[in-house]
């Protein structure tokens, strides 16, 4: 039997890096880890609620969290930062206030920055959110995968693989379907591969979406 390993954890320190930067005492580690999870969930839900692009999804690439003695720095990488700024005249001030309330911090102890991703359709998380939004709207999964591969192909010179599992198109029996374009060398540690898993809640049940993006640098 094959043994599966997480593509990002497999490449940490080689072609991937951590998205949380901090050190903690043993007694504080669980607290900080739980806070990081809450921060990511709050940011993603806020952007999904307040920002809708033409494709009807928020587009968060990834979130980096840095902790210092008296400061928490949150860097949000999104494909469409202008949409978030245009949504509210105060920009992301409300999200900052929600984060301060969540963490119990003063304004000077929290810093939030919004950074645009140069190639948003090269980010697997943004693509996975797009696939999920299409499946929720009952778009056939094969058409969705083909369209997503075309979107990624415009900005990616390597390869992409998309896998969707569950009751596809409302079928009685769950199955797994996948599509690939280009090269996706999962066995090569030095390969610059980004990965994302994203669940999609549909009227037929939960569908699991996995996307691998290989950048040939």
UniProtKB/Swiss-Prot annotation:
What the record says about family reads: Belongs to the universal ribosomal protein uS3 family.
One Pfam family recorded for the sequence = Ribosomal_S3_C
Name the gene behind this protein: rps3
Q: What is its main location?
A: plastid
Any one of the GO BP annotations: translation
InterPro entries reported in the protein's UniProt record: KH_dom-like_a/b, KH_dom_type_2, KH_sf_prok-type, Ribosomal_S3_C_sf, Ribosomal_uS3_bac-typ, Ribosomal_uS3_C
What keywords tag this UniProt record?
Chloroplast, Plastid, Ribonucleoprotein, Ribosomal protein, RNA-binding, rRNA-binding
Which named protein is this? Answer: Small ribosomal subunit protein uS3c
List localization entries. Plastid, Chloroplast
NCBIfam families from the xrefs? Answer: rpsC_bact
Q: Which residues form the KH type-2 domain?
A: 47-118
Q: What is the originating organism of this protein?
A: Adiantum capillus-veneris (Maidenhair fern)
Q: According to its record, what are the GO cellular component terms? A: chloroplast; cytosolic small ribosomal subunit
Task: Give GO MF terms, alphabetically.
Answer: rRNA binding; structural constituent of ribosome
Q: Which domain of life is it from?
A: Eukaryota
Q: How does it assemble?
A: Part of the 30S ribosomal subunit.
């Amino acid at each position: 039997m094959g043994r599966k390993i997480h593509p990002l954890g497999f490449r940490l320190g080689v072609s991937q890096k951590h998205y949380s930067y901090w050190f903690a005492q043993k007694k504080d580690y669980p607290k900080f880890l739980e806070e990081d999870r809450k921060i990511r969930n709050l940011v993603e839900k806020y952007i999904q609620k307040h920002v809708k692009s033409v494709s009807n999804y928020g587009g968060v690439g990834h979130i980096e969290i840095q902790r210092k003695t008296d400061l928490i720095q949150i860097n949000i990488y999104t494909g469409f930062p202008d949409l978030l700024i245009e949504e509210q005249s105060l920009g992301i001030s409300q999200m900052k206030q929600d984060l301060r309330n969540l963490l119990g911090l003063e304004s000077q102890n929290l810093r939030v920055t919004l950074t645009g991703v140069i190639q948003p359709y090269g980010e697997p998380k943004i693509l996975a959110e797009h696939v999920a939004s299409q499946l929720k709207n009952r778009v056939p999964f094969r058409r969705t995968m083909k369209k997503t591969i075309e979107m990624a192909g415009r900005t990616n010179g390597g390869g992409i693989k998309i896998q969707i599992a569950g009751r596809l198109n409302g079928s009685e029996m769950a199955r797994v379907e996948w599509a690939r374009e280009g090269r996706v060398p999962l066995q090569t540690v030095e390969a610059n591969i980004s990965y994302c898993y994203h669940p999609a809640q549909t009227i037929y049940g939960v569908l699991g979406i996995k996307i691998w993006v290989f950048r040939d640098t």
